[in-house]
Amino acid sequence: RSGPAELSHILKDSGAQAWVGAAPDTQYPEVPQLPVLPVRLHARDWHHVPEPSPRRTAFVLYTSGTTGAPKGVLLSRGAIAAGIDALAEAWDWTDRDTLVHGLPLFHVHGLVLGLLGPLRVGSRLIHTGTPTPEAYARARGTLYFGVPTVWSRIVQDEESARALSGARLLVSGSAPLPVPVFEKLRELTGLTPIERYGMS
């Protein structure tokens, strides 16, 4: 969750003009006040809108872990589609899969792969809210996404880790997975975790 200084920078740098959906629940005086465009979740789409060019920007995602203020990275529709399609082919990710994760939806891992990926591939998605070992174990998925912190917690709960042995793929991203965690995860699940790097 971004603090007030980072949120203010991102809104100003991106040229954001409105909140889509609900306004943020925390108001900071230094954060620009923007109009709210509510989203009616029950409404049907009756507009026909032409398909935008693959070169059009789909997202401006802000980097993390950099020195200085976060930097906005423009991701095109075509780049996002190509990235998802390449991983779907490499991982044999299909509409028969159930993806499980509890990652935040403001990074490439959670948003692009964890939300847009299942929509593009047609697979089922279970978002656990919080990525706890117990939530991952209960979900009974075929693919699991996590970051090193999530996997570190999972290997500390051996019963939950063993419950993931029915999956076909464990994916770690966003930072390097420590070797001891990698090895313990492989030992407890019988699966070799796959590491991936983000687009931003």
Please report, for each region that a protein language model flagged, where it lies by residue.
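Short beta-strand->loop structural element characteristic of the AMP-binding/adenylate-forming
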Residues: 1-18, 71-74, 101, 123-130, ...
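Structural core segment of the AMP-binding/adenylate-forming
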Residues: 1-50
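Alpha-helix/helix-capping structural signal
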Residues: 24, 78, 149-152, 175-176
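Conserved pre-ATP/AMP-binding loop-to-beta segment of ANL
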Residues: 44-62, 69, 92-98
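Conserved S/T- and glycine-rich ATP-binding loop of Class I adenylate-forming
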Residues: 57, 63-66, 99, 105, ...
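Conserved AMP-binding A3 loop
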Residues: 58-85
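Conserved AMP-binding/adenylation subdomain of ANL enzymes
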Residues: 81-98, 106-142, 157-158
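Gly/Ser/Thr-rich phosphate-binding loop
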Residues: 141-146, 155-200
